[in-house]
């Protein structure tokens, strides 16, 4: 017997309605050594992002790009992040793919042409995985990049969405992801409405795509308001401590 | 706004390790309470159904009560029931999907006054489970806490009764809060519903059967059956291909031994199996019941068994194909049941003698279900003696591995055995047809039309609708005496010389609002049920016979489809769909219309609308009408020809006839003469259906309701080809066109019955036409094989088919979509529509089955009291249409009966026919070959029966206490039965209808004798008298009726 992901009354397993996000809490500037850092909790998904740069190219100089900065992303997830303990925290195929996706996302958002021949490192670590890890990583990294003071076009806000019984569900939890339905990950630049990255798992009829996309975008805009609040608060705290 | 909590679950994995799972749990300040007493309805967002306002208290069942007594809570008399989410989840997790779905449907059903309260998502109601607290205790605590909150939420204005089975809880909470009472369920029924006897009985019987089960599980005697495997193992096994999933289909004639598993979906492709899987014996069947979705493990090839082709005890149809008995087929055994298909069963208690022989435990009684395919059920009751002469409804509770038979409990009494009303009720229950009279709430929604307060066309509607009352000559053609006229026709010449053809259908959706009580009821019924002597309407008679019926001379709302046709080529130029107001000028009947068409005007006196007029205006009116009918026929011929040309077919007696028959009233007891007018009307309806199908599909490509008729499987035609070959005909079954052509040519001039039988076999090989939702099917599959149309739907009979109501709503939505107006109708999504289609298809099959069973019931009652030996009418002429190892299957055209006749009886004596045509039983042997069977006696005499031979048979009734009676046939002679010529025409007119009439009359007489008023509607019988003479058409229709049913029997599995 499969779980009832959406009850007749419109509740999901954890008590949310279809379009509601999980609780989001975030903090910027968690580490002093790094140029920028941030920590985010989306429900029970917890992620830590650290940014170094922009700095000179490390390693082989040949990787340097003449016209823009190189964005280097690394994703890892803690061995204790999932229900059953993982073997290796990074370097597996899934982590590599996630790293590439993050890179793609941030190349689209960071104004890389301002820093030619330099490198920006983004390290993301997932401490607890409960669905929507990609979204949590992007959101954490956005805050970290801002904390590092690297110019961006806009926030990048990400959120996942699924589709159950003709209804689009925003911000899937692990239980909902594991049920095996279609799942869409969207990274949005909210001000312009441009899409930085869109990814889809499993099949979905094209007629429903628009609906799911809209749900994800709506959720991403919701994430944006929250992140915006966090940034403003952080800036305020920072300016108070500077004594302005 | 939301508050986050965390729930920690400890699960055990397959490997036996414990897994700690943390789930989030969000609480909100308000969830819909669905109470009319709610102080802040806006905050609660009560938009669904509300509890009734006039109840004296609310009742909140504990989780255990919901699990065990859901059937009692289903009584519509129990009002103000609040199901807590905690209790629903307990049902979902511990009682399985079936029970949970029942609960869900109950909550959705507008007729039941119950709601769900999502207490676990409400911040004040949610209680986290404490460390070390038992699940059960927590559930009860949580439900009580929510009940208290609910009481305060309604500002203490409505007392709340929480019913629980937990004595401790009653002790603990009983007097904790004023206004919230905690009592036991039994106590509740006694105090609050002392008069609801049915509920008490049901409650007692559930209680008793549960007690039995408990004591039984303590006794540990040897297991009768192997245990079912756990669900995970089954699912993994199905995925890996080790097990096969399918639906269990018990052989009616050898219910003890033989069952087949029809493969389900993808598994058939993977395993490479074509045929069904045989399940041999009740051990291998392992407690699964007919219709269950089971998981099967294949046995090694060495253990495979063959099916039997011999005629069994009760063999009356010809389903088993002609395989020889020795040929082994894939055989398996059931290892688990995925979904139980238990429903209500009609059973008979054993008679007194049998009870005594059952002996030691008199309280547990084995009852025999009416349906052969269901095993005997063990019932615990003290009323066994009182119930022995009745048909009784029971439900199965459980079937433990330790018990040979399933345990059940008694639900209600239907009626006496052998009593007409009781038997009809049996047929209804067995087909899960529930036709309670329409309730008051439903009737309140109906418009009024009384002489004091006549119904009128409202001015608002007059503005919105196109008014055809003065501009168009609208008329209807129906069988005589028909009262639910749902279609009318019109034709006229436009100013530009083109023709305008119009089909106007009763606008039922105007009166039946979506999701109103009446709509819900109609949806559940899905169709009007026609039994042999009565019918159960889908809509109340105020609609079906009055306001929606397009009677002559009165204003009625209609939905119209109008085509502009080219004046000469009849090419369709334009089409218009919309709501209209019409006034039908004539309500013609078929015979009259045909007479007018043929230019025979003497019929005028039979047309009431013309009779009253003076000569001159009569003449003018008549000319107008005759022109319209003539034109209509001409157009219909053209359309028909075009359809034929498009690779279509002339497949007599398949869908065209069904269509025609379906079109108006399937009081199939009024078989129609094959007049051309029938065809004309049918063709116009097909055209309308086709165009509406196109329209709704274009507007709603993923949620339109259409009707498909898949092409038949070639393998099914093999029997037909074999039979035809016996007579020297060749049947080409490659396409519908060739099939129709070769059937036409397969005509034996000496015996017209041969052709009819071949056609009925062809019909049998066809798949059934089905409703479906366009979103769930590829476009190529929309095709309608029988009509050779790419898209088809049902639009023309909304009075008696729910599918047509859905199509009407779709069409209305499509029109407003075209006009860029907002769509008022709330349409079904693809998923819901698909579910609805399944329901309607299911109900249609039930309707057909019940119709067939009721016909058989009447046949049996007709022959029951006659002495087969002496009475002349029990002897009839029959045709052999199939050969088996120990007998033949015979069709008797005079009564439309199909049945088996044995050539070898129980004592292994075979039949032998003397030269003068008399027959007797003698020792000997039988020899069967492809198309003949030879019976040789020990003395050396032999008789040969060929396929399509005419024989004389004697009809008698085999009475049965527990099941329906059956007709038994006995071959009297191998010569055709000769009816004395003078009697021929008189005799042969005895059709099913006459038979029904006679039976009903005798029943009525019996009832009158007891001074009980016969409930059967007399007027219906007047109409049966109209049938005169036996036409081949009617004959074919009858064969088809039975044939189609046989097929549907197998499809229903």
Swiss-Prot record, chain B:
SUPFAM superfamilies xref list: Nucleic acid-binding proteins
Alphabetized SMART domains for the sequence: RNB
Domain CSD2: residue ranges: 365-431
Modified residue annotations for Phosphoserine: 989
Organism superkingdom: Eukaryota
RNB domain mapped to chain residues: 465-816
Subunit (UniProt): Component of the RNA exosome complex. The catalytically inactive RNA exosome core (Exo-9) complex is believed to associate with catalytic subunits EXOSC10, and DIS3 or DIS3L in cytoplasmic- and nuclear-specific RNA exosome complex forms.
Protein name, as recorded: DIS3-like exonuclease 1
Primary gene name: Dis3l
């Amino acid at each position: 017997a499969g779980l009832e992901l959406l009850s007749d009354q419109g509740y999901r397993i954890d008590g949310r309605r279809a379009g509601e996000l999980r609780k989001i809490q975030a903090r910027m500037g968690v580490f002093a050594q790094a140029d920028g850092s941030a920590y985010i909790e989306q429900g029970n998904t917890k992620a830590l992002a650290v940014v170094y740069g922009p700095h000179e190219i490390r390693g082989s100089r040949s990787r340097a790009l003449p016209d823009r900065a190189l964005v280097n992303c690394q994703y890892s997830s803690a061995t204790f992040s999932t229900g059953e303990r993982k073997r290796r925290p990074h370097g597996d195929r899934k982590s590599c793919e996630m790293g590439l996706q993050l890179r793609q996302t941030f190349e689209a958002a960071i104004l890389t042409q301002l820093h030619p021949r330099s490198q920006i490192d983004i390290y993301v670590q997932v401490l607890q995985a409960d669905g929507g890890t990609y979204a949590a990583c992007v959101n954490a990294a956005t805050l970290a990049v801002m904390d590092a003071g690297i110019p961006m076009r806009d926030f990048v806000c990400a959120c996942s969405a699924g589709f159950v019984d003709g209804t689009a569900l925003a911000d899937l939890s692990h239980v909902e992801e594991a049920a095996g339905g279609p799942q869409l990950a969207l990274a949005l630049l909210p001000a312009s409405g441009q899409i930085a990255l869109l990814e889809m798992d499993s099949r979905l009829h094209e007629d429903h795509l628009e609906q799911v996309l809209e749900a994800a975008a709506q959720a991403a805009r919701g994430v944006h308001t929250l992140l915006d609040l966090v940034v403003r608060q952080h800036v305020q705290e920072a300016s108070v401590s500077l004594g302005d | 706004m939301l508050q986050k909590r965390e729930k920690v679950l400890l699960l055990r994995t397959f490997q036996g390790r414990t897994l700690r799972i943390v789930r989030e749990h969000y609480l909100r300040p308000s969830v819909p309470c669905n109470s009319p007493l709610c102080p802040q309805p806006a905050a609660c967002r009560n938009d669904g159904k509300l509890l009734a306002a006039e109840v004296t208290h609310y009742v909140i069942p504990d989780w255990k009560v919901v699990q065990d007594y859901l059937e009692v809570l289903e009584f519509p008399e129990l009002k103000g029931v609040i199901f807590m989410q905690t209790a629903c989840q307990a049902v979902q997790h511990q009682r399985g999907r079936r029970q949970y779905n029942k609960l869900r449907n109950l909550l959705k059903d507008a007729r039941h006054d119950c709601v769900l309260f999502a207490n676990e998502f409400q911040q004040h109601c949610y209680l986290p489970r404490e460390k070390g607290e038992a699940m059960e205790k927590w559930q009860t605590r949580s439900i009580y806490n929510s009940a208290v909150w609910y009481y305060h939420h309604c500002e203490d204005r409505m007392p709340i009764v929480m019913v629980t089975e937990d004595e401790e809880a009653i002790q603990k909470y009983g007097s904790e809060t004023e206004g919230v009472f905690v009592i036991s369920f039994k106590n509740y029924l006694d105090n609050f519903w002392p008069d609801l006897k049915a509920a008490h009985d049901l409650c007692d019987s559930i209680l008793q059967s549960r007690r039995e089960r408990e004591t039984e599980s303590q006794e540990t005697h040897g297991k009768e059956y192997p245990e079912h495997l756990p669900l995970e193992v089954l699912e993994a096994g199905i995925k890996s291909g080790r097990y096969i999933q399918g639906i269990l289909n018990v052989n009616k004639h050898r219910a003890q031994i033989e069952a087949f598993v029809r493969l389900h979906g993808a598994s058939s492709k993977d395993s490479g199996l074509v045929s069904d899987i045989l399940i041999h014996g009740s051990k291998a069947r392992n407690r699964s019941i007919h219709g269950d979705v089971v998981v099967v493990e294949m046995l090694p090839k060495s253990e495979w068994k063959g099916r039997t082709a011999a005629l069994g005890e009760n063999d009356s149809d010809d389903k088993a194909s002609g395989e020889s008995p020795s040929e082994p087929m894939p055989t398996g055994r059931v290892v688990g049941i995925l979904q139980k298909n238990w429903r209500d069963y009609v059973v008979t208690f054993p008679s007194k003698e049998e009870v005594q022989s059952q002996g030691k435990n008199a309280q547990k009684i084995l009852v025999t279900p009416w349906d052969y395919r269901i095993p005997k059920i063990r019932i615990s009751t003290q009323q066994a003696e009182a119930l022995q002469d009745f048909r009784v409804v029971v439900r199965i509770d459980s079937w433990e591995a330790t018990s040979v038979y399933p345990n059940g409990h008694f639900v209600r009494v239907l009626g006496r055995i052998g009593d007409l009303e009781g038997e009809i009720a049996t047929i209804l229950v067995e087909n899960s047809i529930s036709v309670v009279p329409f309730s008051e709430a439903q009737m309140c929604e109906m418009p009024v039309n009384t002489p004091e307060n006549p119904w009128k066309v409202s001015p608002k509607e007059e503005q919105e609708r196109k008014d055809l009352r003065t501009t168009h000559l609208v008329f209807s053609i129906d069988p005589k005496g028909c009262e639910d006229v749902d279609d009318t026709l019109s034709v006229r010449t436009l100013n530009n010389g083109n023709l305008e053809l119009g089909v106007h259908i009763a606008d039922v959706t105007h009166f039946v609002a979506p999701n109103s009580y009446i709509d819900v009821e109609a949806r559940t019924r899905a169709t009007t049920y026609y039994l042999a002597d009565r019918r159960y309407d889908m809509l109340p008679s105020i609609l079906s016979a009055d306001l929606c019926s397009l009677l002559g001379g009165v204003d009625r709302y209609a939905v119209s489809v109008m085509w502009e046709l080219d004046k000469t080529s009849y090419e369709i130029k334009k089409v218009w769909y919309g709501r209209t107001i019409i006034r039908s000028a004539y309500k013609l009947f078929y015979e009259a219309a045909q007479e007018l068409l043929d230019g025979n005007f003497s019929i005028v006196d039979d047309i009431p609308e013309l009779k009253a007029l003076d000569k001159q205006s009569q003449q003018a009116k008549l000319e107008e009408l005759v022109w319209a009918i003539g034109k209509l026929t001409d157009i219909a011929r053209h359309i028909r020809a075009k359809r034929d040309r498009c690779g279509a077919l002339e497949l007599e007696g398949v869908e065209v006839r069904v269509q025609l028959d379906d079109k108006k009233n399937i009081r199939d007891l009024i078989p129609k003469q094959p007049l051309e007018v029938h065809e004309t009307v049918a063709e116009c309806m097909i055209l309308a259906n086709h165009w509406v199908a196109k329209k709704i599909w274009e507007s709603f490509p993923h949620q339109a309701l259409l009707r498909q008729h898949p092409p038949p499987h070639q393998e099914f035609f093999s029997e037909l080809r074999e039979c035809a070959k016996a007579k020297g005909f060749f049947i080409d079954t490659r396409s519908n066109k060739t099939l129709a052509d070769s059937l036409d040519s397969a005509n034996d001039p000496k015996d017209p019955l041969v052709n009819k039988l071949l056609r009925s076999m062809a019909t049998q090989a066809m798949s059934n036409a089905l409703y479906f939702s366009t979103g769930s099917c590829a476009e190529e599959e929309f095709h309608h094989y029988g009509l050779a149309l790419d898209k088809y739907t049902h639009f023309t009979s909304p009075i008696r088919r729910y599918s047509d109501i859905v199509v009407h709503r779709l069409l209305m939505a499509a029109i407003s979509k075209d006009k860029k107006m907002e769509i008022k109708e709330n349409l079904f999504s693809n998923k819901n529509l698909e579910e609805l289609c399944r329901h309607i298809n299911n109900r249609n099959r039930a309707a057909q089955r019940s119709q067939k069973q009721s016909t058989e019931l009447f046949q049996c009652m007709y022959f029951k009291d006659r002495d087969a030996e002496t009475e002349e009418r029990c002897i009839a002429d029959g045709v052999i249409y199939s050969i088996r190892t120990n007998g033949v299957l015979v069709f008797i055209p005079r009564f439309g009966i199909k049945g088996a006749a044995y050539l070898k009886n129980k004592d292994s004596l075979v039949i032998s026919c003397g030269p003068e045509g008399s027959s007797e039983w003698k020792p000997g042997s039988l020899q069967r070959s492809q198309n003949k069977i030879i019976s040789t006696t020990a003395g050396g005499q032999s008789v040969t029966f060929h396929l399509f031979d005419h024989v004389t048979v004697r009809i008698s009734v085999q009475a049965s206490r527990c099941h329906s009676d059956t007709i038994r046939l006995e071959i009297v002679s191998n010569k055709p039965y000769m009816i004395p010529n003078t009697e021929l025409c008189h005799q042969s007119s005895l059709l099913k209808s006459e038979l029904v009439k006679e039976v009903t009359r005798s029943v009525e007489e019996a009832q009158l004798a007891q001074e009980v008023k016969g409930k059967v509607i007399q007027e219906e019988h007047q109409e049966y008298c109209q049938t005169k003479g036996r036409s081949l058409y009617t004959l074919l229709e009858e064969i088809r009726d039975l044939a189609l049913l046989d097929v549907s029997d197998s499809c229903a599995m």
